[in-house]
Amino acid sequence: KKQLRNEMKALRAACGDRAARDERVCARFFSLPASEKRSFFIYNAFSNETATAQIAARLLREGKVVCFPRTEGNEMVAVRWQGQATVKGAFGIEEPVGEPFGGEIDVCVLPLLAADGQFYRIGYGGGFYDRFLSGKKIYKVGICYDFQIVGRVPREPHDVRLDALVTDARTMIRR
């Protein structure tokens, strides 16, 4: 897993046309039936991750509930974001200030370093999303650049499968 993570980080860092790719990912995301749902839990992109700002902004304009993650120790909570201040969290990622969201989350947009056609992903290795999603009925969408889709990612029994994968070049929906 470590080698694959490092490989993908290097490929992403070398990617020169991220803005155009991000726009295509955003357009493809909104072609998903799941984009019509009411409440969304979306990662706040940092470094050279696939950007989520356009997706979050459009969902807000459409009157949807948008939550960003905040880490609390070894766990992650959803905090509704309505444009309020953010502060740098434990991993240097901007996290929203405020109370955890008490409602149901319909769709989770997950970050990933690599994913495969069986809808498994590898993230950064902290297990935050696997723990957060465990036992919840939430539609899971992984977004990334197309070069991050590989033949097979290493997997473990606790790994949560995605319901859809959206890249700058294709949309894959698990049947």
Question: What residues fall within each predicted segment?
Answer:
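N-terminal active-site beta-alpha-beta segment that forms phosphate/nucleotide-binding
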Residues: 1-103
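Conserved phosphate- and dinucleotide-binding cores of soluble alpha/beta proteins
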Residues: 74-175
